Amino acid sequence: MPQYFPPTPGGNATTLNITAATILKAAPGRIYTVSVVTAGTAVGAIYDSIALTGNTTANQLGTIPQAVGTYPFAGMPTASGIVIVPPTGGAVAVSFA
């Protein structure tokens, strides 16, 4: 019997140690929390996209600060997909659905 895991308040998936631009999900989803675990030298970004290139402020959902910390995004929805660009030289962990 297939299992279905509905989205939970904190997301139902996590990707750790993101150090380069990454497509987390190539379908609509939600961003819950971004944790900067290694500080960077410039801010990163979250995009509503399914491509690693060509992203602009037109499809940017938010910025990822360069300082170590946990930053909530409260289940912000995406229409296309989820692309994470971590702070330059930094590493992040992301919870999403």
Predicted regions and their residues:
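Surface-exposed, low-hydrophobicity beta-strand/loop segments enriched in small/polar/acidic residues
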Residues: 1-97
